[in-house]
Amino acid sequence: MNCFSYFFLVIILCAGLNNAKFNEKNSVIFKSSLGPKKLLRIHCTSEHDDTDYVYLRHGQTYAFSFHDSVLKTIFDCELKQGSSYYNYNFYARFRAYKGGGLIVHYGKKNFWDAREDGIYFTHGKETPKLEYKWIPGDPSMRVESPL
């Protein structure tokens, strides 16, 4: 190969890497498909992050993005549904994202859809499937007996 061939190869490789999804953030996306008078409360945490409380009405979405850690990346979330900010009738706790370790993901998307019968999941390429059922009650209102 002559110098021009090497130069051309480097240009092609640089252009290809520039267009790749390398270093694109991963995302967790939530949608409320609950009834029009229902409120969805979302709270997600990881070892280093806390999303605070997010409230969605019917049809609204919420997303957060991040890079995978080389060690591991885990986001656990609690969703509650109810008729107001202080009245929740059902909840669900689950792992909304797991990644990192030996395989670092780039541009991975986890879509969660809160519906009346439960929480549905997809990566966006397939039809969402029911992953979690709602649990009756509000865990923050439970009182443990001292006995």
UniProtKB/Swiss-Prot annotation:
Q: Where does it live in the cell?
A: Secreted
Q: Where is the signal peptide?
A: 1-20
Q: A Pfam family in this protein?
A: Self-incomp_S1
Q: What is its main location?
A: secreted
Record keyword Secreted present? yes
Residue ranges the record marks as coiled coil: none
Give a GO cellular-component term: extracellular region
- Record keywords: Secreted, Self-incompatibility, Signal
Q: Which GO terms describe its biological process?
A: rejection of self pollen
InterPro entries under this entry?
Self-incomp_S1
Q: Which family does it belong to?
A: Belongs to the plant self-incompatibility (S1) protein family.
Q: What is this protein called?
A: S-protein homolog 10
User: What is the native source organism of this protein?
Assistant: Arabidopsis thaliana
